[in-house]
């Protein structure tokens, strides 16, 4: 059984411009050695290959493809689409594939490939990330505030808007976070992400521009978001899917910044990019993992 864990590292220095509206790229530069060493250690411990894909001709050519398809938005969004393009390239070489963002810290030696049977379907995790009253209010197409482009409420609304526009039954209760994805070749092929991009983005332009279920201050924040697109394609293409659950995708963000990860948290996703907080974990003493030589 050929197994792979892969990630992407492209920083704003390499790409020659900022990463859009998102301010955390310097944090990834600073903590790159620590995070890569930990991810590689995990891959080695479970007998999987580990690959880091960076800025180079493959990524430049991919951005050219996006521009030719008229779906290019920014370097940041290109990186998010790139993870699926890479999966499509890798599916002929590996039986089971785990993608994790560089800000994911493996906090276990348990083998995810043995614990979750990916032959039963690709696996991701979705979660609500809003105040309880707004989670409820979103079900009526409204919020008490104008969300940001990257808020889960915006992505979830976009996912539902796409499904509604195309008369597709939403297969996922909540939009997936694609920072951790357990994949198999048949699932990757059935999602058909890159080949579907142009058509889906035309649909996004439609649902963004016309009145619909969601308030205009929500739809006005729609972008060509990979997580909404992926979730829609899983639904539209009837891809067999299972949930990773919070143990395999424990989210650390602004909502729970003061909360230490549970000892049961196997993969910690530092969406807040506060990598220095890992030094305070009682479950691991990981600052020694930083390569200083």
Please give the residue ranges for each predicted region.
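Catalytic core and acceptor-binding pocket of nucleotide-sugar-dependent glycosyltransferases
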Residues: 157-278
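N-terminal anchoring/stem segment of glycosyltransferases
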Residues: 1-82, 89-93, 221, 225, ...
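Short catalytic/ligand-binding loop motif for oxyanion handling, primarily in non-cytosolic enzymes
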Residues: 13-15, 59-62, 106-109, 114-115, ...
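Long, compositionally biased intrinsically disordered regions
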Residues: 265, 280-293
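Charged, glycine/proline-rich intrinsically disordered loops and linkers
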Residues: 16-24, 62-74, 133-167, 204-216
């Amino acid at each position: 059984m050929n197994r792979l864990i892969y990630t992407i590292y492209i920083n704003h220095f390499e790409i020659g411009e900022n990463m859009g509206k998102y301010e955390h790229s310097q944090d990834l530069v600073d903590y790159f050695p620590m995070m890569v060493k930990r991810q590689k250690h995990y891959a080695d411990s479970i007998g999987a290959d580990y690959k880091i894909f960076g800025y180079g001709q493959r990524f430049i050519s991919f951005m050219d493809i996006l521009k030719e398809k008229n779906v290019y938005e920014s370097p940041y969004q290109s990186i998010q689409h790139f993870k699926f393009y890479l999966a499509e390239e890798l599916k002929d070489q590996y039986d089971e594939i785990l993608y994790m963002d560089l800000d994911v810290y493996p906090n276990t030696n348990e083998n995810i490939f043995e614990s979750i049977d990916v032959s039963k379907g690709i696996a991701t995790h979705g979660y609500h990330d809003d105040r309880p009253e707004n989670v409820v209010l979103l079900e009526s197409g409204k919020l008490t505030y104008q969300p940001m482009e990257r808020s889960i409420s915006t992505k979830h609304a976009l996912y539902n808007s796409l499904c509604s526009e195309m008369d597709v039954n939403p297969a996922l209760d909540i939009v997936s976070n694609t920072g951790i994805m357990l994949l198999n070749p048949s699932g990757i092929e059935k999602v058909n992400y890159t080949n579907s991009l142009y058509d889906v983005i035309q649909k996004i332009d439609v649902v963004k521009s016309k009145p619909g279920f969601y308030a205009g201050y929500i739809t006005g924040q729609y972008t060509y978001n990979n997580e909404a697109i992926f979730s829609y394609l899983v639904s539209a293409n009837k891809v067999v899917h299972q949930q990773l659950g919070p143990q395999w995708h424990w989210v650390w963000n602004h909502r729970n910044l003061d909360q230490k990860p549970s000892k049961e948290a196997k993969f910690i996703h530092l969406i807040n990019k506060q990598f220095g907080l890992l030094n305070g974990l009682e479950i691991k003493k990981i600052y020694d993992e930083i390569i200083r030589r």
